[in-house]
Amino acid sequence: MSTKKIASLCVIKNKSKFLLLKRINEPNIGKYVPVGGKLKDHETPKKAAKREVFEETGLKFNKLEFCGVLTETSPTNYNWISYIYLVETDIVDIPKSNEGKLEWLDFKEIKNIPTPKTDDIIYKYIIDKK
């Protein structure tokens, strides 16, 4: 088993819609994911989430709500510990991203698009508030 990679993900939400990134690079190429990425040395998960949001969307948010930690364990090289954050916004304009295409998608649409299986629990937690 490989060493776990540590990442921060930020779910950006506007009412019932989520701003998701259709990735053009690995990991999860061709799948819709929250924005985020790996932590840098000596960086807190929250600072990493803010940095990744800005790098991938150009947006800045100060108020991020911590939702929990998602641990993925696999016999492959896909092993992650991800700190999950939520930001609720009134922004509707879709920014451009070098990481792929950003889209506002309703929660009901998410089950019909390609997403990592582990992300289902993230969206369900945010919608159900538990």
Regions found by a protein language model. Name each.
Residues 39-62, 72-125:
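Unchanged
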Residues 17-55:
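Conserved Nudix-box catalytic region and its N-terminal flanking loop in Nudix hydrolases
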Residues 33, 65, 84:
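Conserved beta-strand segments that form the floor/walls of ligand-binding pockets within enzyme
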Residues 1-19:
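Conserved N-terminal beta-strand and adjoining loop/helix that marks the start
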Residues 128-130:
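C-terminal regulatory/oligomerization modules of transcriptional regulators
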Residues 68:
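Catalytic phosphate/metal-binding cores of nucleic-acid and nucleotide-processing enzymes, i.e., regions
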